[in-house]
Structure formats: structure tokens, C-alpha cells
């Protein structure tokens, strides 16, 4: 293999390894479901969101009727989401971030994992309600 071919292969590997962004994941209208099948109140849904967030290090703040804002700070990285909810559904949508390379609808790939974990946590708390 020539040096230029080796260099090209190395450059490609570095470029691919540097791909640390992914499209921003938003959760839209996830169903509110309890294990018993009984409808939950707004207070129960809010409490489930707060418990799920707290268990994962999110700071949850009520910003208005049926609207929570979640903030996750890990070292120098900050993610902020808004979580509108009702007795039937909730959403988790990107609001802002610091040091997460957000630009043009893409963000650091770890962000989506945090949102998936938060969504799973909320669903687990709703089921337990």
C-alpha cells in the first residue's frame, strides 16, 4: 500500500470517528399508560415526569400549566427540553443546549441517548402509577 493510500485510509477513519452528531430526537405525543389501565390525573403524570427525571439527574421545573422544563447538566454539557403533558400524552422536545454541537437540527449523539433514557423512565413511572 502506498503512503498516500495509507494516509487516505487514515484520514477517512479520523473523519468517520469525528462524526459525533445525529439528528435531534424529539418525542411527540407519547401515550400516557398506567399498568392498571385506569386514567391518570395531571398531577400523577407530572409526578411521574419529575420522578423519572430526578432518577436520571434531570432538574425538572414547572413552567406553566401542563408544561415541565427539564435540564440535564453533565460536566460542561447542558441539555434543556420542554415536556408538555396531559392525561393522555406527553412530548419531549429540544429547547436549548450548551456544548452539544447543536446546529441545523443535529446535535451531539449522546443527547439522543439521554432523551431515550428519560422517555423510558417516564414510561416506567407512568406504568407504576
Across the structure, where does each feature detected by a protein language model lie?
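Bacterial N-terminal signal peptides that target proteins for export
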Residues: 1-8
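C-terminal motif of bacterial Sec signal peptides marking the signal peptidase cleavage site
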Residues: 15-18
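Ser/Thr-rich, low-complexity intrinsically disordered terminal regions
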Residues: 20-129
